[in-house]
Amino acid sequence: MSGSKKKKITKADRLKQILEEEEKRQKEEEEARVKYEKEEMERLEIQRIENEKLQKLEAKDLERRNEELEELYLLEACFPEAEKLKRDNRFLSQWKHYIECDGSPDPSIAQEINTFITLWKEETNETLEEVIEKSKLVLNLIEKLKLILLETPPYDLQGKNIIQYQESILELQELLHLKFNRATEILLRQASTLADLDSGNMEKVIQDENVTLYIWANLKKNPRHRSIRFSETQTGFEIPRILATSDIALRLLHTHYDHVTPLSPVLTPSQEHISIVTDFVKEEVKSVQTAVSKDLQEENKQENESNSVHEEETKAEGQGDVEEQMCPVQEEPEATKYEMEMKLLSETVSAAQELLLENASEKPYFLEENEVDLCQFTTLGGVYHLDILELPPQCKPMKGWMIVEILKEGLQKYTYPPETTEDLEAENVFPPIEVTLEVHENVIFFENPMVARWDAEGKQWKTDGISNVSYKSEERLITFNLETFCPVTLIQDAHINMPYQSWELRPLDVNKVLLTITTVFTELQIQIKENLCMLASIKVNNKNHSSILEEKWMTPVSFIIALKKAGLNIFPTGHSHLYVVINYKHPSVEVKAYRQMALLSSAFAFCWSKWNTACESKKTVFQVREHLLKEEPIRNPNWTLLMFSGDRAQSLKINESSDAFSEALKEETEFHSTLYHMVKDFASQEAMRAVRRSNCQFVDSVCHMLLSTRLLSYS
């Protein structure tokens, strides 16, 4: 055999190799174990140091908690002060109305409003122009009553007053519509004298800031005259042959307000809320009585000592000394009484604010088929009252007089289609009527509007009986077929701008801020100063959009109503969470956050954070930075990320660009019980002075707008 032979490994060599590998493995395992234990010890040591540090910070926070809360309580005295000012203003406006004696009633006084209604009912033969002029006062009275119900805190509204105001509103609404019907009848009696020379029919259009009235009287009954267009408008009808040959009149009364939809229920506190406030009142009264009693006893003791030492002088001084000694006794109870009033008012305001954020557990009522859910949708642009009327007997000239037959039953509606018909093809004989309406110019629709009709029997808006709806957004025209004439309205999803994409609150001037809210369709900029709000600008689909609301200062409640009427609803209700995916935050946490953000808003800017959705419902996360008025706008400002639970505020280690959420405390920062003391750690003295000098009405208005928009839950 040739060539080298491969060396054969012996059993001893194999055993030696196995032992070496085992020793190496054990050595590596030991090194890994030692390394792991070392790292674990280091980690535990770091964790221990961190825990000790956190415990010290928590202990420090707990130690100064009472002091911080007391300071916050003093700052939050602006809320009861603002409420007291609002109460005083309500009384003052009533007094001013009383001394002006302008002839208009005070709608809050039942006797005055009832007298006004009775006297107006007695007025007859009013023309449409006269009714429209009178309607301005009536609408003003209705708005005043609605504002009383919305602006008065729930705890100040008695049940009987709510019923009284709502009944007055309904009676005024019904009477106003009745007056329009009577005035329409008077006009239609003269239709033959007002006939158009070309068509031979009567046509009249009356436009006003609150109503637009279109009336067409079919005098010629020409079967070929089936297309009706009112002059200088695109509003009109396509009527079937049977109507074109009938003694009828068509009326379109477009009220720019909605007096058809049932009144919204007034927000009232639950029994639980009432008991909380009642218990607080009892405790405060008891403590005040104890304090007053103690003060009086101390005063009497001092008085007795003074009398025993200076008995002779007292006798000589007589009554003068008695008056001097009584002064401090009278002053103390007055001061204590005021203090009790403000404490009670503070508790009432807090409870009312939490009531604003309560979420309903379910929808308020069961929906029928085709019924419009008024919790989900809202009517916009007013109501179009569509009526087919029987043409009343016409005026006839006779020997220099105008003779007219007046029907006892008044203005009668023409039934179309007839309630009973033997024709099997009734749809062909009585086809739907095509209606073309002009959409109110001051209303914004972000999607094509839906059309709803009023079901008088069921007292609800319904979507059946309407077909072939088409909308021309550029021309603001909507056309549809209607089976029978009745009031119709345009509806839009009330939550189309919810949830919000982002928001920012920043100072503009002394006691003036700008609130910017960005949604899928629009960006709204709202200015707030003192007790007023204003729409500063609006963008729709990233383009500037003009609105009649711009540059108009209004009280917060009036401003919210105006925005809703314009289709700019950014104000959730207690049922909104049933229709919108929200980032739920506990009401008590939200209220505390909004109150303290409002307190700081004169010197600090706040904005949304994407991490607010990552934390639990009892914690909120947002960004904050100092913003003094003299500063130039910063392109990329440095924001501090804060987490607030209502009881504790802390600065977070992460920022908006971090990969994951963490509640880790930012280095070299501490825990605090309030946002005020949290920002105080990094704020300038000038900023804190600006906060302390804030106007109470301004702070209250900012807080009201934050509570109404619910930025932390709906963004």
UniProtKB/Swiss-Prot annotation:
Residues 291-322 are annotated as: Disordered. GO terms for molecular function: beta-tubulin binding; microtubule binding. InterPro entries: IC97/Casc1_N, IC97/Dnai7-like. GO terms for cellular component: axonemal dynein complex; axoneme; cilium. Ubiquitinated. Ubiquitination leads to its degradation through the 26S proteasome. Ubiquitin-proteasome-mediated DNAI7 degradation occurs in mitosis. Pfam families: Casc1_N. Keywords: Cell projection, Cytoplasm, Ubl conjugation. PANTHER family: DYNEIN AXONEMAL INTERMEDIATE CHAIN 7, LUNG ADENOMA SUSCEPTIBILITY 1-RELATED. Belongs to the DNAI7 family. This is Dynein axonemal intermediate chain 7. The gene is DNAI7.
